[in-house]
Amino acid sequence: MEKKPFVTKEQVEEIVKKYPTPFHIYDEKGIRENARKVKEAFAWNPGFREYFAVKATPNPFLINILREYGCGTDCSSKTELMLSKAIGCKGEEIMFSSNDTPPEEFVYANKLGAIINLDDFTHIDVIDKLIGIPETISCRFNPGGLFSIANSIMDNPGDAKYGFTKEQLIEGFKILKAKGAKNFGIHSFLASNTVTNDYYPSLAKILFELAVEIKNKTGCHIKFINLSGGVGIPYKPDGTPNDILAIGEGVHKVYDEVLVPNGMGDVAIYTEMGRFMMGPYGGLVTRVGNMKHTYKEYIGTDACLSLIHI
């Protein structure tokens, strides 16, 4: 598949007459078309929401474009929560997923009405003492071991610092329910920047089966399942991009096979994509200052590493 820039050299030459380099430029049309396709891909699920991963591109103007398509914000720090508040996000439009979390960030997230996604079993006691247990609460699951798709190892969750073990998750839900929680979410992130249409459906199957088991063992009402991020983009011109419509239908198929027969056809699906939502539609415009020809070719520009996003 041939990949072409969304802006021509001639257009850039005109733009730099007004805006000095370095700067980022974005394809608004591309962002909107992709957001529309994501919404279409999961239209079969009435409760679906994409929570854009703010860390991927913390630009309020761009996030507001996504909000026009029903997107919320996925935050992992107080700064990201503050940005979300500043652009008008509130309540369950905000998902707060963090680890090694300072107590004051839980307090601030709760003040905004955000859904809190706990990363650690010990955080149950922490938030209970800080803010009490919210009616809606989510927990992050780490299955451990290796995560494979079609016999290909995608990642090693067992080496990751994130999430509850299965045993901790079941016990945690029991404790949270006893302390007043009424609506529960399950979240998991098992691989980064996957370029395959099978990642979300494979992850969904794991989480859907887990949700059924948890419901049967705890009686908890599973309100949503959050597939998090991990849907990637090709970085080379000849790479094949993910087909979000095929991905959405793959998740739909597993949903109908696992959740619906178990009386869980009301579970909402959430995602937290960042790179997939914004990565292909932005570029860094920089000017070459020097070219050095030694054992390798070196190009010196007026940009630096801190300006490179995603």
PLM features per residue range, with description:
Residues 1-116, 121-135, 174, 178-182, ...:
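A charged N-terminal "starter" segment
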Residues 20-22, 91-92, 107-115, 151-164, ...:
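Glycine-rich tight-turn/loop motif centered on a GG-T
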Residues 31, 55, 77, 109, ...:
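Conserved, mostly hydrophobic/aromatic
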Residues 59, 80-82, 102-105, 143-160, ...:
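Conserved radical SAM core fold
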Residues 63, 85-86, 106-108, 127-130, ...:
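Short acidic, glycine/serine/threonine-rich loops at helix termini
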Residues 76-79, 97-100, 136-152, 183-188, ...:
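Non-cysteine beta-strand/loop elements that form the S-adenosyl-L-methionine
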Residues 120-182:
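Conserved anion-binding
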Residues 195-308:
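C-terminal active-site-proximal or functional interface alpha/beta core segments in diverse enzymes
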